[in-house]
Amino acid sequence: MTAENTTTGATLLRQVVPPEKRELTELHVHLGGSVPIYRLWEMGIARGIRGVAHSYEDFIRLLHRSSENTGDLDHYLEIFDIIELIQAGPSAVQESILIALNGAYRTGGMTRLGPGGEGGDPEPIFTISRLELRFNPMKRTGVLFSRGEPSGLFDVDRIIRAACEAAEESEIAYRGGIRTGFLFCFGRDMSWEVNRTLAEKVRYWKKSQKKILGVDLAGPESAMTLSNPAELEQMAELFDIAAGDDLGRTVHVGETPHVNLDTFIATIKALKPHRVAHPVVAARSFWEQNDARGLELLAERDICCELCVKSNILTKAIADAAEYGRFIRTLDEFGIRYTFSTDSPALQLTTLANELEFLLQHAAVTPEQLLRAFSTAEQATFIKG
């Protein structure tokens, strides 16, 4: 799947999206993957960050997530330390959020991008009018978590405040054309001390900052599977501290073989998410072992699934377009709601329009399924109103 598609592909999507659906809601986008590579290069140069890359060309090759340098979730995530360092600090977070929102509004409905992620389509099919951004504020403090330090160069309180101010400024600039808010991610690759600090910060700031929509659990599943009941209980406590009953809950779980079906089920029951990202293990267990417990749990609790097509294929969570079609049909079979998002559009040189065209071109989704997913996103968003 490439960022540049044929005119026929563009026509397919344009025919499917009716005039009244030209403003879409996107639920699953990471801030670290939403700033175009050429802008990250400029930010790194401006901040004098050492060792970003030997050249601009090397930088693009390093950060661009493709089939040549990915292969599984761990490899997919390995360059995010560089991005988080470039985005460290209140001003860098503000700049990143403004760029991400501008990009979503301008290029989300485009079918062609330039080599650095700049928009290249003069006639976008739609705009993104509501966008949920997720990131980990602790990873924007400038700290190297591999050294086990719980705090960094920058104040996390100022980072959270700066993010919320940037969101409000963007909405004013667009005159209501785009609305946004944040999911703050606990890290599977962070210590319990750091994750607890984040939980307490969210609990404090959610009282005054309406742009804080919810919490998430993200990062490499290999680093923390939560198969240990004691660890799962700890994470559930952090979700309760941060989200309580007034914030949305979503969780990355079941994307890789590191998490089996039993752990997937236990995680859903303990963390009580409203939405779940990439729950591939639930479908694969049904296909391979005829074990429908995961799918039945998602249906029973009316949990919405966040599907990110290109990243799921890059990490080998889903093999190809044909298997993606099977995945979607399986969710429909069990009456499970789902939405489509880009995950890290800038790093994959993709757009939401590009992802949807890919599905249509390969007959992995029908127009009816696509329109239903649009409506589901509008209903499932944590952005109120």
Model-derived regions, located:
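Metal-cofactor-binding active-site regions of metalloenzymes
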Residues: 2-249, 253-385
